[in-house]
Amino acid sequence: MSRKRSLTSIGQLVPELPVTDVERAQQHYRDTLRFEIGWLYEGEMGSVSRGKVAIFFRKRKPPFEAAVHWVFAEDIDATYNELKSLGANIVDPLEKKPWGLRQFTVEDIDGNRFYFHHD
């Protein structure tokens, strides 16, 4: 009889986004999404955080493809209104999608997209 091993505990997933300018990306996330600027390493890598969410940035090199992330929002209306008031680039407005989620899309200055949603 085989015995299943329990997995060791791991922490949260931290996305690393490709950006054209790390410091500019940090400032953009601070100003339009209310993240706090974290560390910066020689202009090549850096981080921001908000609550339990952290994002790393790395200066992009070809070939480049933007990243997509799904972000659950407990209060989707408040999140939408907050980000809209901050001037976030909302490329798809808040609406109920055919697949049942209420969601909206924010695109950052480097084309990375965030699908904010609530079930």
PLM regions with names:
Residues E16-P18, P98, F116-D119:
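Short beta->alpha transition motifs characteristic of CBS
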Residues L13, E44, A67, G100-R102:
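Residue-level marker for the onset of beta-strands and adjacent loop->beta junctions
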